[in-house]
Amino acid sequence: MIDGHIHFHKQPYTLEIIDLMVEEALKNDVTTLYLLDHTHKFYEFLFLYDNLSGDETLGWFKKKIHVPISEYLEFIKLVKSKEYPVEIKFGLEVCYMYEYEDRLKEELAKYDFDFLIGSVHQIKGIGYDLCVEVWEGQDTDEFYKEYYYKTRRLIESNLFDILGHPDCITAYEIYPSFPLKPYLEEIAMLLKKHNMKTENNTKRGGLKHEFLEILKAHNIPIHLSSDAHRYYEVGRDFKDYIDITFGKNE
């Protein structure tokens, strides 16, 4: 079983952290780890965040610690030189911004990661999932339309292997005035067309039932993801999501 979304976050790039992640994986019957960090951690990708706006979002970004991506790449080489009882893959979670797509493509071409997750974390420069307060005064319909537009552009960019937490926008149970099903159907069809996978992210309560059923109907590959930011969150709550995601006989 895959845990397809595990961050180092504030944890150091050390073999001790890898050992702890592997130990947690074995406890939860996880056989493959997809390890990553956000692009906002690395100097080389900070151009993606030039248009952030709103007090909450700007405050969030100012607290981030940035390092050169070479630190991560050297650590990847070290880990790949070792043997572990689980498979370990390394990648990035990219905050997709269509206005910087050409520059992003050039930067990503410099690296040879095992996988790339593309995620929509900001709408019109605002980190919509940072806290419910960021929704105050916003046009919910426009937020949703922009979210799905960015998601379409992300998939059509052909830069990514996996679409990260695809219905994260519903995290606060704030919904637009229009039905979501046509948008969800379109996302599923695009994922199919562009041979992309997606995830059932257990940190965020999992995929909503309607979206999960649409993805299944289109035979979109889905794996479980803990979205762990600490080693002890690897495989978080997977037992509660296996049947829902894969069916009782799988």
Task: Specify the residue positions occupied by each region the protein language model found.
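A short acidic, amphipathic alpha-helical/loop segment
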Residues: L20, R103-E106, E186, E210-I214, ...
